[in-house]
UniProtKB/Swiss-Prot annotation:
Pfam families: Ribosomal_L12, Ribosomal_L12_N. It comes from the Bacteria. CDD domains: Ribosomal_L7_L12. PANTHER family: 39S RIBOSOMAL PROTEIN L12, LARGE RIBOSOMAL SUBUNIT PROTEIN BL12M. HAMAP family: Ribosomal_bL12. One of its GO terms (biological process) is translation. Forms part of the ribosomal stalk which helps the ribosome interact with GTP-bound translation factors. Is thus essential for accurate translation. This is Large ribosomal subunit protein bL12. The keyword Ribonucleoprotein applies. GO terms for cellular component: cytosolic large ribosomal subunit. It comes from Laribacter hongkongensis (strain HLHK9). Homodimer. Part of the ribosomal stalk of the 50S ribosomal subunit. Forms a multimeric L10(L12)X complex, where L10 forms an elongated spine to which 2 to 4 L12 dimers bind in a sequential fashion. Binds GTP-bound translation factors.
């Protein structure tokens, strides 16, 4: 029996955010594509200026450290995830905690994670 589009949509609809994130990454790896929106062609001068000053940063949890419970609490507070999803994120490190945040927010998140005992970085 073949799988229909409706079967796929139902399965995707039942997934958590973390499961959907893993699914997207699996698609990117298997098919060599990117889920990022395609950028409209911009003038070369504007692109060079944008490359010089980065305005959006990603906070990446690289290791949970010894005090995993505190790290899970901080991840939950930063992301709004449920307990299971936050635990899965911490257990599956390295994982991106937040994407596209300002430099000040990224530094604040990094400080909270490191104070909880985690190892994290800003990309």
């Amino acid at each position: 029996m073949a799988i229909t589009k409706d079967d796929i949509l139902e399965a995707v609809g039942a997934m958590t955010v973390m499961e959907l994130n893993d699914l997207v990454k699996a698609f990117e790896e298997k098919f060599g594509v990117s889920a990022a929106a395609m950028a409209v062609a911009a003038p070369a001068a504007g692109a060079a200026a944008a490359a010089e000053e980065k305005t959006e940063f990603d906070v990446v949890l690289t290791a949970a450290g010894d005090n995993k419970v505190n790290v899970i609490k901080v991840v939950r507070a930063l992301t709004g995830l449920g307990l299971k999803e936050a635990k899965d994120m911490v257990d599956g490190a390295p994982k991106t905690v937040k994407e596209g945040v300002s430099k000040a927010d990224a530094e604040a998140m990094l400080k909270q994670l490191t104070e909880a005992g985690a190892k994290a970085e800003i990309k």
